[in-house]
């Protein structure tokens, strides 16, 4: 058995195709028009046209306005509630997304809960949510409540 050396490597039979020689006579199979069709811009030298070229028509990338921002990829969506909306709830209770849906504060439990700090909180609550803003956390703790972050 021969040793494996770089100068003795060969491709498997049928793994490599021969290069197509274009424009070398009709008998070669790709003579005359070389597989580029009859006439027109796509059959001329210097083909093909550049990407985005639409035959002289104003291309799409120039027709569409330049926008000033990009949407965040994989952005997190939350069900948001302000601390002012929590004043209607019973003092001393534990509040989570299911409790808010039952009490009609939030309509849908589709996304995790995030508590925002708009308004004033007058009741002491233990709130379980996925996220809190800094102002919401300070207002809840100032009212004597606690914030628990859920995963």
Curated annotation (Swiss-Prot):
GO terms under cellular component: cytosolic large ribosomal subunit
Keyword ATP-binding on entry: no
InterPro entries found in the cross-reference section: Ribosomal_uL15, Ribosomal_uL15/eL18, Ribosomal_uL15/eL18_sf, Ribosomal_uL15_bac-type, Ribosomal_uL15_CS
Gene3D superfamilies in the record: 3.100.10.10
Gene Ontology BP terms: translation
Residue ranges of the region described as Disordered: 37-57
Mitochondrion is among the record's keywords: no
Entry keywords, A to Z: Ribonucleoprotein, Ribosomal protein, RNA-binding, rRNA-binding
Gene Ontology MF: a single term: structural constituent of ribosome
The family this protein is said to belong to: Belongs to the universal ribosomal protein uL15 family.
Stored PANTHER family: 50S RIBOSOMAL PROTEIN L15, LARGE RIBOSOMAL SUBUNIT PROTEIN UL15M
General function of this protein: Binds to the 23S rRNA.
Subunit structure: Part of the 50S ribosomal subunit.
Listed name of the protein: Large ribosomal subunit protein uL15
